[in-house]
Amino acid sequence: MMRWVMAVVLALGCRALAASPCTIQTNWLCAGTPQATPCYVIDSGRTGPVVLVVGGMHGDEAGWAAAGQIAAWQVRRGKLVVLPQANRPGVFQHTRLQPAESNAALRDLNRNFPTKTNAAPRGALAAAIWAQTKAVKPDWLLDLHEGYPKLATRTNGVGSSLIVMTPMLTLPVVSNLLDAANTIVTNTAQRFRLLRQPIAGSLARAAGDRLGCHAVIAETSRDNPNISERTRQHRLIVHRLLRKLEMDANGPDVLTRRQPGVIRVALYDDSGGHTRVSVEDKLDRAGDLETHRVDGGMIERGVLEQFDVFFAPGGSGSGQARELGEKGREVVRKFVQGGGGYVGICAGAYLASRSTKRPYLGILNAGIADVDRGRDVVTVELTEAGRKLLGCTERELKINYHNGPVWGPGQKSAPACEVLGVFRTEVFPTNRTTRVTMSGTPALITGTYGQGRIICSSPHPESTAGLDAIFLHMVRWAAPK
C-alpha cells in the first residue's frame, strides 16, 4: 500500500469520481510537523450514520494498509471517515511506537487518549486525533490493530479478537462482525473471539466512555504470515458493519481506483511468494507507484481488474502456480493478454515461463533449461536494449542470484523474447552435476502476451544494493502505455 503519496492519490480519486454523489474532504492533522497525517471524510451527501475507521495507531501493524484501502471506498448514506496512518512516522519506519516522541511515557500513541482520571489527551498527535474524533461525532469507531492469539504458551494475547465496550457485547451487530471476521479463517487457533473493554488510554475506550460511541478494536492475528489475508479480514469487518448500517456502496475487495499518473501494482502475497517489506517500500517511495498485496483468492475474484501491473516475487514458482490454481492462472493470463503488465523475479520468472513439467503460466516464450543452481552473486552483461530500457549506463552488473531459472529456447511460433542481459558467470549446483551451461544464457528478458508486456529477471535486482532504479524501470516499463 502506498504510504508516501496517499493524500495526493485520494484527492485525485475524488476528482476522478466527479459523477459520484460522494465528496472527499482531506483534513491534515498536525499539519506542518513530522507527525502530519491525513484524515479523509467521505460524505455521501445523504443523512445517515458516521463511521470512523482508524489504522496505523501502531506503525508496525498492517491495520494502516487495510485502512488505506478502505479510504478508497464510497458510501451510499452517511459519512465514512478514515484516518489510515494515525502514527505516520511509525508506519514509515515500521515501528510500533512514535519514533520522534522524546517523552518515553508518550511513545505508545494508543495510551494517550482521555481516561476517567485524565480528561485531556497527552501529546500533540493524540490531541489532534481526539479533536478530529469529537468533530466528526462518530456513531461507530473501528480501530484496526494486530496482535498475537491467546494460546497455551501465550496467555495474554489479543490477536484474532474484537474488543468492544462492555454494553456492546449483546448487540446482534457485534456477533455479525465476528462472523464476518471468521469467514476466511481456516486455522482454529486464529478464529476471532469477543473481548470486553478496550484498554484505558486507547482511542476506542475514550470514544466509548466520553462520546457514547460504539467502539471496536479489531485485532487480526500476527501469527498469520499472509498480510493480504489479514488486511482482508479488517476490510470484511468494516464492510459488514457498513452493510448492516445500509451504507455499503462497494464490495470488500475494492483496494484502489484509477488515478492520473499513478501505476497500480498488485503484489502477489500468498503461498510460494516472498514479497519483502523492503521491496514494497522501494515501490511506495517512487511516488508514481501504488502497491497493494493480493492473494490467490482475491485474484480469482477478479481484483486484478483494479491494477496496471502484476508483480510475482521470489519464492517458489511451482508454489505460486499451485496456489493460484487453474482458475487463478487463467485470470492472470487474461489480465496480461488484455494489456496488463507482468513483472516476475526469480520464482516469478519461473511462473511466467513455459514448462512441460509444471503448471506455469506459459505467457513468456522461454523454456526452462535448468533449475536449482544455488545461490551466489553473478555478473550480468546488459545488452544495448537492456541498458536503454533499464536506464543504466553500465555494461556489467553484479546481481544477487538465488536459484533463478536458466532459460532455453521457447516456441518458434510464439512472439520472440528480447534479451536485456546475459549471465557471464556460472553458478554450479553443489548437490548434482549438470551439463547445462549458464554463462551466455539470458538473465533478464522481455516479451509480449496479447496486448500485455512481460519483463522477467532470473537474478534479484530488487534485493541488490544500488539497483533500485533498475527494478523501478522494470515495473514502469511493464505498465500499459
Give the role of each language-model region.
Residues P38-D43, A204-D209, R435, S439-T448:
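Short, surface-exposed beta-strand/loop micro-motifs that present aromatic residues
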Residues L236-R258, R333, K357-G362, G367-D370, ...:
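Extracellular ligand-binding/catalytic regions of CAZymes and related secreted enzymes
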Residues V380-S463:
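Catalytic beta-strand/loop cores that center a nucleophilic Ser/Cys/Thr
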Residues T256-F307:
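Aromatic-Pro/Gly-enriched surface loop or interdomain linker
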Residues S318-E396:
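A glycine-rich, often tryptophan-bearing local segment used as a flexible ligand/cofactor-contacting loop or short
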Residues M6-C39:
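Short glycine- and acidic-rich boundary segments immediately preceding or forming the N-terminal edge
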Residues W28, G48-V50, D60-Q190, D209, ...:
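Active-site/substrate-binding loop(s) of hydrolase catalytic cores
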Residues Q197-L255:
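Active-site-adjacent mobile loop/cap segments within catalytic or ligand-binding domains
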